[in-house]
Amino acid sequence: MILESKGNEKLWSLIFISLMLGFLILVLYLRVVSNKVIYLMLHDSIDLEVYEAMFKVEAEKSIKPYRATYQENFHFVKGQVTYLKGDFQAAKENFEKINLKKVWKRFSTDIFLRLTYGQLLVSIHLQDEPAITFFEEQLSKAPDSKDGKAKLVAQAQAIKDIVFNKEVNDYFDTTEPENKLARIMFSYYGALNAQLKGDEERARSLFESIAHENPELFYVQEAQKYLEGEN
């Protein structure tokens, strides 16, 4: 009987361990699916309200060990959304609320890289030269994350050249956008770049290609202003 009891204990232990492993695999799978949906909501559906709301729920409802990290990430998301809407001062203020010390170390490298890139773009559009210099240096020193740093550095340099330096930079003409939001962004800066070259026909064509997209985006708002000014 004792041997049978021990055998049952081992069996139930194995069943319990198997169930726990299955549960963990399911949780990880659902997290991957959730992140994919959120990514598509921004980059392809471009639904800023739903995108922000999904991160708000994550920040408010996540389990306690993750909550601080998700709350800090939500500040980033709010900064990202206000930037896309063209409220650069509000974006700056949201980014400044982020406390990286509250972020889990395994997530901090990625958030720091994206945050520094975001702060640099905000500074460029606010024409804040000291801040541009500071965040350029921060971005150059930032550790890479998911092999994405080189792309962010190149994009930031191109935007700085076109918007702040008023110099031609063909990055947005020679690089393929990865999604719908990127295509809109590339068309906008490509149009500004065409204007710097004196090619108003190409600028008009690029502005026209995005003028009917989500009007919340400042890229679209500026394209519409340009086209209205021509009429």
Task: Place the predicted regions along the sequence by residue.
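Structural signature of alpha-solenoid helical repeat scaffolds
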Residues: 62, 66, 103-107, 178, ...
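Long, non-transmembrane cytosolic or organellar matrix-exposed soluble domains/tails
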Residues: 174-231
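Non-cytosolic head/periplasmic domains of membrane-anchored proteins
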Residues: 104-160
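"A position-specific structural signal for the A-helix of alpha-solenoid helical repeats
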Residues: 35-40, 70-80, 111-121, 149-159, ...
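Helical anchoring/docking segments at protein termini
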Residues: 1-49, 198
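N-terminal topogenic membrane-targeting module
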Residues: 26-104
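Alpha-helical repeat scaffolds
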Residues: 50-61, 88-99, 127-143, 164-179, ...
